[in-house]
Amino acid sequence: EQGMSAYCYTGSYQIPVHTLTDSIVKDIMMIQEIIGTGEIAISDHRSSQPTFEEFARVVADTRLGGVLSGKAGIVNVHLGDSPRCLDLIERVVDETEIPASQILPTHINRNEMLFGKSIEYALKGGAVDFTGNEDIDYWETICDEVRVCNGIKRMLDAGVNPDRMTISSDGQGSLPMYSSDGEFLGMGVGQSSCLLKEVKECVFKTEIPLEIAISTITSNPADILRLKGKGKVQEGYDADLCILDQKLQL
């Protein structure tokens, strides 16, 4: 009625997943706005330390819900600092019939080790999601986080399909703040405005073509999440438009 589109995932960091009905499949089938499950945490001290079987069942149920409802049935996966990195995701892809297209790992630029593993995963056809930051220099200074523009450039140079990369903001989510010594200072709030800032960096800092940079926050997420009528300026699509000048200022 308001002309706004909104989508969400069922679940949380933990497995067993907290659902609105009594199952993941029913949530996705019966609630129009729910397009998948997430953000399931793995390789992180804040996760529920799921086993392979538990994680695989969540992905399988989410895929089934997507098939029955005509939605993406995506599992958005939070990746932490553990050296296990994408191990559970890779096992699902390698050991079951579930394709990599059902899983979207996020925070892949959290550290250098995870990023290296993510390049390997993306080269196999998996989609990967970078986490953008409002204060880009701050995060690069206090940890070994891979700057988004540098990460995308490295993936492109490695031969990753540009269509398999997205940037998300953690907008309005909790954002831990640390000192230069790694001391926890408190919680901030993620800002969705970081998305355009990261695109600017891609274009002006690492000279990534605008059509590739802008697709990470437009057509790529729309295609991966199967959001009908979204992500492109095209006849029959929603007119979700932002007007930018030559310096990419809104």
Regions found by a protein language model. Give the residues of each.
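Residue-level detector of anion-binding/catalytic polar loops
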Residues: 5, 74, 127, 209, ...
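Conserved beta-strand edge residues that scaffold enzyme active sites
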Residues: 13-14, 135, 217
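His/Asp/Glu-enriched, well-ordered alpha-helical/loop segment
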Residues: 157-244
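General structural feature for long, well-ordered alpha-helical segments within catalytic domains
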Residues: 51-58, 71, 84-88, 114-117, ...
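Active-site core of metal-dependent hydrolases
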Residues: 46-47, 54, 60-178, 184-185
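Short Asp/Glu-rich motifs
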Residues: 17-19, 140, 222
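Divalent-metal coordination cores built from histidine and acidic residues
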Residues: 1-54
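Short, intrinsically disordered, charge-balanced linker/junction segments flanking boundaries
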Residues: 1, 244-250
